[in-house]
Amino acid sequence: MFPLIILISFSLASLSETATGAVTNLSACLINHNVHNFSIYPTSRNYFNLLHFSLQNLRFAAPFMPKPTFIILPSSKEELVSTIFCCRKASYEIRVRCGGHSYEGTSYVSFDASPFVIVDLMKLDDVSVDLDSETAWAQGGATIGQIYYAIAKVSDVHAFSAGSGPTVGSGGHISGGGFGLLSRKFGLAADNVVDALLIDADGRLLDRKAMGEDVFWAIRGGGGGNWGIVYAWKIRLLKVPKIVTTCMIYRPGSKQYVAQILEKWQIVTPNLVDDFTLGVLLRPADLPADMKYGNTTPIEIFPQFNALYLGPKTEVLSISNETFPELGVKNDECKEMTWVESALFFSELADVNGNSTGDISRLKERYMDGKGFFKGKTDYVKKPVSMDGMLTFLVELEKNPKGYLVFDPYGGAMDKISDQAIAFPHRKGNLFAIQYLAQWNEEDDYMSDVYMEWIRGFYNTMTPFVSSSPRGAYINYLDMDLGVNMVDDYLLRNASSSSPSSSVDAVERARAWGEMYFLHNYDRLVKAKTQIDPLNVFRHEQSIPPMLGSTQEHKYSSE
């Protein structure tokens, strides 16, 4: 933590020393280029409302956290191009925010020493569906929920494969891959992108052909904030039945009981038919002692099994009871509905029992209620975990009432799509992915260090049971514990093209976590970064560094 504390201090110092002239220059440039929707720290009346609207992890809302000098909300591609031009001209670092769900706050906080701005894409959220071609264009600021809603308005037999959080921005989600309940059937969100419009650091609007296949490959799964700003994605619509089945299955019990179910789950779920996804959310029971131990079988762990099946309830019951009788799925634990209703059912808009208002227009809401403080980490499991290993999971989980685990099953299309098809590499050979989470509220924030140490200790305890050499991680669940390249960015900005050794060092240092996220695809991502953004204009604490080598200074033009 020591280097991070030092860099936070540098960032705060740089903020306090930001020249009034630089602020004036950027403000004037934006206005001269017809960009009028922006707020300035700390004088603009609505600055903090804008900052916090899409700030989803309250760990980064603390007063001592670095603040952007500007928050800019472009509403057209012309304004977006002008925004990039003006920010570069005034020497402001750019952070791009779509939905603000970055696990480490990289879309709205910078620990670099430079003054920075947020380019917020919330005004670029149009979704245009073309059923004839079974495609849609979604602007980079559209949320997943907005995409789902737009599709459902014109078809009840089409869907898109993405995550369950409707307020998550498509720009970041698709850039990192985008796993969801349809991924075993259709692959990731990024697997279903057929074209894109990318605005690079030189203000060029590039489609797939213009950007080239290496860059188009990189923007699908290579992580957000690296390549430029995606103005829009062209996505493939996916055929689904009119009726699907959802299940929420609760099986609270002792650690021994839950471990037995999980031991079977890890074998069954990767081999289910592709139409069937069965994930698990685990949390400590956290019950009063008289309730927890009042029965002969103690309730220590509370598992929630979430199932989506692309077909009728009768088939769900038949398949589950044949392949996984230990779970004992009951008729009243499952419901038939349309696909878009299932998206609402599994979203944060539903209550703990999956109940919702049934109003699918709620999927368009951008603001997320119930924000909290959280820290996440990820792993991939390639070999079945023993009963003792499962018990180890649960013993560690029980230690923290603010902790929980999410198990996402792989197999199906995730096995069939090549690990080099897009930049996201975690494919065949993975049984399931693990997400570790500690989440707390303001009243508990005095315990934040305890929760952070718990999740790091849990992660270390899991080492024998998960992938290795390298240990895998998912870029959409950023984890700064794996390393940061703030020093690398400083070197890159100050290195000359005739002295490439610093860029080589930066690439090699970033390899430590870059290969955890991208495995063997890391070097190709460096190549793509060097091609599209050699001056490292678009960067954050875990972005892909370019190689400098023969790079020449680009002359930026807004024309």
From Swiss-Prot:
One of its GO terms (molecular function) is oxidoreductase activity. Mostly expressed in roots. Coiled coil: none annotated. Disruption phenotype: Strongly reduced nicotine biosynthesis but accumulation of dihydromethanicotine. Inhibition of jasmonate-elicited formation of anatabine and other pyridine alkaloids. The keyword Flavoprotein applies. Induction: By jasmonic acid (MeJA). Keywords: Alkaloid metabolism, Disulfide bond, FAD, Flavoprotein, Glycoprotein, Oxidoreductase, Signal, Vacuole. GO terms for biological process: alkaloid biosynthetic process; nicotine biosynthetic process; response to jasmonic acid. The modification Pros-8alpha-FAD histidine is found at H101. One of its GO terms (cellular component) is plant-type vacuole. Belongs to the oxygen-dependent FAD-linked oxidoreductase family. Involved in the biosynthesis of pyridine alkaloid natural products, leading mainly to the production of anabasine, anatabine, nicotine and nornicotine, effective deterrents against herbivores with antiparasitic and pesticide properties (neurotoxins); nornicotine serves as the precursor in the synthesis of the carcinogen compound N'-nitrosonornicotine (NNN). Catalyzes a late oxidation step subsequent to the pyridine ring condensation reaction in the biosynthesis of alkaloids. This is Berberine bridge enzyme-like A. It comes from Nicotiana tabacum.
